[in-house]
């Protein structure tokens, strides 16, 4: 039998996070980029260009520098021949997440990627976010998401309510059904509100790998 999830503690309780600067600390001003090392640089570069609508800043047989915003590069792909696949049980980064401005943009992106034969392996409402998970050609997980609440404080209040402790995974959903409801005019607040777990279902039953 699976063990029960350990209740999470929210250090910021219901007030929302306090930035390091407000706390009088010197901290990074932003997260700059991430780097993938791969033996299939061209394929990986094209995948990230497609998924993120990124453009190539600089590219040759050794590397690709990509960006989708004002940063000089958000993603770097390094060519390293002969690499072995990362074992599923290896320690390391689980996934990297990208936030969209609204549900319409997220659903449009899902449809655009589906036409490019890039489909999510996991669609889930975590509570704080509505999320689509994808795997790049090397099997690394990428999350495309929206925030379900309008502010960090609202998210913190929801998490402090105990709802996240009850279900720290979320509720899976059918993306095409979600699109149908969205196009029929169901309010976004209702579409992104996380429903309760079905009777007799564990949070761990919602995991997709």
Roles of regions detected by a PLM:
Residues 25-28, 90, 115-117, 136:
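Alpha-helix termination/capping residues and helix-transition junctions
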């Amino acid at each position: 039998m699976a063990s029960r999830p350990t209740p999470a503690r929210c250090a910021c309780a219901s007030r929302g996070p306090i930035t390091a600067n407000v706390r009088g600390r010197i901290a990074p001003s932003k997260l700059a980029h991430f780097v993938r090392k791969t033996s299939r640089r061209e394929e990986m570069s094209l995948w990230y260009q497609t998924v993120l609508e990124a453009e190539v800043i600089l590219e040759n047989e050794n590397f690709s520098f990509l960006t989708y915003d004002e940063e000089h590069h958000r993603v770097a792909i390094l060519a390293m021949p002969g690499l072995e696949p990362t074992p599923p049980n290896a320690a390391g980064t689980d996934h990297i997440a990208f936030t969209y401005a609204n549900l319409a943009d997220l659903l449009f992106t899902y449809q655009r990627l589906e036409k490019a034969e890039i489909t999510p392996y996991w669609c889930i409402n975590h509570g704080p976010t509505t999320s689509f998970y994808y795997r790049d050609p090397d099997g690394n997980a990428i999350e495309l998401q929206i925030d379900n609440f309008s502010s960090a404080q609202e998210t913190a209040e929801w998490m402090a309510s105990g709802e996240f402790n009850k279900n720290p995974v979320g509720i899976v959903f059918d993306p095409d059904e979600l699109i149908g409801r969205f196009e029929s005019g169901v309010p976004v607040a209702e579409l992104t509100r996380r429903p309760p777990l079905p009777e007799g279902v564990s949070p761990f039953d919602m995991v997709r790998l």
